Regions:
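Catalytic active-site module of serine/aspartate enzymes centered on a nucleophile-bearing elbow/loop
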Residues: 276-307
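Short beta-strand/loop motif that positions the catalytic acidic residue
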Residues: 246, 252-254
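Short glycine-enriched nucleophile-adjacent loop
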Residues: 137-148, 154
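Conserved HGGG/HGGXW glycine-rich cap/lid loop of the alpha/beta-hydrolase fold
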Residues: 20-99
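Conserved acidic catalytic loop of the alpha/beta-hydrolase fold
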Residues: 98-99, 106, 110-128
Length: 307
């Protein structure tokens, strides 16, 4: 397998080689001597979706915060040589031909979890607190399942277990998620307002959505990776049995207004993981509005305080 890495960027970032052929772009906030917190972003989103002010707020609470681009996104390694025909992929999955579907996707959710662990290794960090959002929550769960000794605590935000009966999207949110965005900059920014379909209704902010879309487009527009990430997520299957045996202190955070991953996904996650605490946030959708940052940081800081 040959992968290629983006070689241009609009702002300096650090880069770490985490495995053969895969490099991960990352940024850090705070004092390296503080307890490390690894932030794992979701489907198709760059690390800047963890806003730098949010990261600084978390770091201000005495945490060494690390955010990074998942593979096939942002400034991390891109898998140009593996184009995916999503129609064929979906047909294979729907028809039960999982081996054929797997052959179309060059990596798995486990590989993506390995990237995060590899980044910690490259930074000389043996153990860390892991915080994952949406698909990032699935990746974070996988980190805790596959390498529990390296996970001090797990925080799974607006995510689910991979079971089909939990965490399903509302039809309008699902339609918005999979509606194609124009390839030109202005069209992409305008189309980003579709995210209002799953945003926190009370704090809905089209301006903030458009600002992130513009920054993401200018930093590293790369829609080709989305299909491969989606394939890895679909093929990951259920983590239910593994979560039942997890022995990692876990906090599950889910917005009660989430229409992209129904709150049943968070409730089910907390139900399965022994000793997990569940924080259901009123007025929060499938996003992290600035108005809730302090509450979210306080919850993460409290959860990571004693591990």
């Amino acid at each position: 397998m040959r992968a290629s890495r983006c070689c241009w960027e609009t702002a300096p970032v650090h880069e770490a080689r985490v495995s053969d052929g895969v490099s991960i772009a990352y940024e850090t906030f705070g004092d390296p001597g503080d307890p490390p917190v690894l932030l794992v972003m979701g489907f198709g989103a760059q690390m800047i979706a963890w806003h730098e002010d949010f990261c600084a707020m978390l770091a201000g609470g005495g945490r060494y915060v690390i955010r990074y681009d998942n593979r096939d996104c942002g400034l991390s390694t891109r898998f140009h040589d593996h184009p995916v025909d999503m129609s064929r992929f979906i047909a294979a999955v729907s028809g039960g031909d999982i081996p054929a579907a797997q052959a179309m996707i060059p990596y798995s959710l486990r590989d993506m979890a390995g990237d995060g662990m590899g980044l910690l290794t490259a930074l000389g960090i043996e153990k860390a607190h892991i915080v994952g959002s949406s698909m990032g929550g699935m990746i974070a769960q996988t980190m805790a399942i596959t390498q529990p000794a390296r996970v001090l605590t797990l925080t799974s935000m607006m995510s689910s277990t991979g079971e089909p009966d939990y965490g399903q999207a509302a039809p309008a949110a699902q339609q918005a998620l999979f509606s194609p965005s124009p390839p030109d900059r202005q069209g992409y920014i305008d189309a980003s307002e579709k995210e209002l379909a799953w945003s926190s209704r009370r704090y809905a902010n089209a301006g903030a959505i458009r600002e992130l879309a513009a920054r993401s487009y200018d930093r590293a527009y790369y829609p080709a990776g989305i299909g491969r990430q989606l394939g890895a997520m679909i093929l990951a299957g259920s983590r239910a049995d593994a979560l039942k045996t997890l022995n990692v202190p876990t906090l599950v955070i889910h917005g009660l207004d989430d229409t992209l991953v129904d709150p049943s996904g968070g409730k089910r996650t907390a139900e399965l993981i022994p000793g997990a605490r569940l924080l259901l946030v009123p007025d929060m959708g499938h996003d992290r509005p600035r108005e809730l940052w302090q509450d979210l940081c306080d919850a993460i800081e409290a959860h990571t305080r004693f591990a």
